[in-house]
Amino acid sequence: MMIRPIVKYPDPVLQQPAEPVTEFNEELRALVDDMFESMYEAKGIGLAAPQIGISKRLTVIDLSFKENPDEKIVLINPEIIHREGRQYEEEGCLSLPDIREKVVRAEKVTVRAQNLDGEWFEMDGEELLSRAFQHEIDHLDGVLFIFRISALKRDLVLRRIRKMQRAGEW
């Protein structure tokens, strides 16, 4: 297993739709292992392949943060097939360190995805899991959470990022 560096905004790989996963093999399993290790190292609960510079429709999630291996989720070529309700909570992102903003998301979602063997399955998520599904699938579509907030807030966030870049803190 290898810890891979997290790509930061404005890297182009974060802003374009990822390519579908077509090969389900040991290389994919190794990538998933690397993604979990990289996510844990960065203290995250979710990580999409574009966040480590790989344009593939693949994401990993672990709300237990290593406490319960049964809660590790791998979503390959995921899509949201049902949304219900509304929640407005603060989000952060490993590709946008130190940036946190409130984002409107569906309260409940159903995701359809493939597992490591290429088999399709459906999974429901509520509250934080629903938010994680939506946040990570957005990454696969080239959308960062700062593009789900108001233009005014986004402008303030982008100014803050530019200031950190000029100061060498980004």
Swiss-Prot record:
Cofactor(s) in the UniProt record: Fe(2+)
Q: Where does Fe cation bind?
A: C93, H135, H139
- Pfam families from the UniProt entry: Pep_deformylase
Which enzyme class? Answer: hydrolase
* MF GO annotations: metal ion binding; peptide deformylase activity
Q: Which reaction does it catalyse?
A: N-terminal N-formyl-L-methionyl-[peptide] + H2O = N-terminal L-methionyl-[peptide] + formate
- Name the CDD domains on file: Pep_deformylase
Bound cofactor: record note: Binds 1 Fe(2+) ion.
The organism's place on the tree of life at top rank = Bacteria
| A biological-process GO annotation | translation
**Protein biosynthesis found in the keyword field:** yes
Q: Which family does it belong to?
A: Belongs to the polypeptide deformylase family.
SUPFAM superfamilies named in the record: Peptide deformylase
Which protein, by its recorded name, is this? Answer: Peptide deformylase
Q: Where are the annotated coiled coils located?
A: none
The protein's job, in short, is: Removes the formyl group from the N-terminal Met of newly synthesized proteins. Requires at least a dipeptide for an efficient rate of reaction. N-terminal L-methionine is a prerequisite for activity but the enzyme has broad specificity at other positions.
According to its UniProt record, the EC number is 3.5.1.88
Q: Which UniProt keywords apply?
A: Hydrolase, Iron, Metal-binding, Protein biosynthesis
Metal-binding keyword on record: yes
User: Which InterPro entries is this protein grouped with?
Assistant: Peptide_deformylase, Peptide_deformylase_sf
